C-alpha cells in the first residue's frame, strides 16, 4: 500500500516529532503554561477547520456509506474540540479572539482549499498525515503509561 510505504519512508520524521520537547512536555505535563495555552488556541482553530474539511468531504460523498464515515469523523473532531474548549476555559484562553499563527493558518488554508476544490480521495489524502501522526503519538506515549 502506498500509505504504508510513505509511512516507512518517513518514520524517522515521525520519531523526531515524538521526541520534540513540545510533544514530550505535553505528554509529561512539563510544558510551560503559556505555551500550553497558545497550543490550545491554535489546536482549537485547527480542529474547527479539520471538522469543516470532513464535513465538506461528507457533502461530496458519492453514497450514504461514505457520507456516514466522513460525518462520523467530523463528529469525533467536534468532540475533541469540546475538550479543547474546556481547556480554554481552564487556562483563560478566549477562543473567539484567538488568531491562528502562520503555520496554523497555512495548514488550515491548505486543508480547506483542498476540501473545496478536490474530490473526497484528495481530501482524505490531505488529512491523513495528521491523523497518522497523532495516532502514532498516542500509541507510543501510551506504552509509557502516558494517557
Predicted regions and their residues:
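Acidic, low-complexity proline/glycine-rich segments
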Residues: 1-23
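A ubiquitous short alpha-helical element
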Residues: 5-8, 35-42, 92-97, 122-123
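Alpha-helical bundle segments that constitute or directly flank the non-heme di-iron/ferroxidase center
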Residues: 11-16, 30-60, 79, 125-135
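A generic alpha-helix surface/boundary motif
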Residues: 21, 51-52, 82, 105
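Short, charged/polar, low-complexity loop and linker segments
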Residues: 22-28, 111-113
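Short, flexible helix-adjacent loops and helix caps
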Residues: 27, 31, 55-63, 116, ...
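Active-site-proximal alpha-helical scaffolds that flank and shape metal-associated catalytic sites
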Residues: 65-147
